[in-house]
């Protein structure tokens, strides 16, 4: 049995449908590798050493590719200072200021922990501004 097949079985045994994200499950992409073990640039490798071009971009957040030098260096620097503080960090303010510079109509920026929290905040703001109670929604979430 290949390492990829072994991992596929372990995922099926440990996680419903073999994936925590429906879009990653082998049910929808049976010819794709069961597991990716590393990435470089736009390429990823599975447990059997096969190389693929990652057209998914890790489902969105890896727009610069894997192991992008400037991103990796920024992560290393931040790790040396610590992460996830219970108080504001200067980087939070610097990024908010940059967002306000880049987006002409933005007067302030706020960061939230999850997409669900961000959507809930947007709905509250929209309801407060419009005075309306109903919201129509449709979309894909993972």
Segments and roles (model prediction):
Residues 138-142:
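Substrate-binding/gating loop at the entrance of the active-site cleft, primarily
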Residues 20, 40-41, 64-69:
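Short capping/connector residues at structural and topological boundaries
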Residues 1-38:
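Active-site-adjacent loop/helix segments that line or gate small-molecule/cofactor pockets in enzymes
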Residues 51-134:
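Glycine-rich loop-to-alpha-helix module at the N-terminal edge of alpha/beta enzyme cores
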Residues 15-16, 45-47, 70-71:
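Short, flexible segments with low predicted structural confidence
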Residues 29, 41, 60-61:
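Short active-site-proximal "capping" loops at secondary-structure junctions
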Residues 2-10, 45-50, 100-101:
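Short, hydrophobic/aliphatic alpha-helical segments
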Residues 34-54:
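Active-site and channel-lining beta-strand-loop segments
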């Amino acid at each position: 049995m290949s390492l990829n097949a072994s991992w596929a079985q372990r995922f099926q045994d440990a996680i419903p449908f073999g994936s925590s994200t429906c879009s990653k499950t082998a049910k929808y992409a049976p010819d794709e590798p069961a597991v990716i073990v590393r990435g470089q640039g736009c390429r990823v490798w599975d447990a059997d050493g096969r190389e693929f071009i990652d057209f998914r971009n890790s489902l969105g957040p890896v727009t610069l590719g894997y192991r992008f030098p400037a991103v990796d260096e920024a992560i290393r620097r931040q790790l040396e200072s610590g992460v996830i503080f219970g108080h504001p960090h200067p980087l939070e303010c610097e990024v908010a200021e940059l967002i306000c510079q880049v987006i002409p109509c933005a007067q302030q920026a706020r960061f939230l922990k999850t997409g669900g929290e961000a959507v809930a905040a947007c709905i509250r703001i929209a309801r407060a501004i419009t005075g309306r109670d109903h919201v129509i929604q449709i979309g894909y979430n993972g």
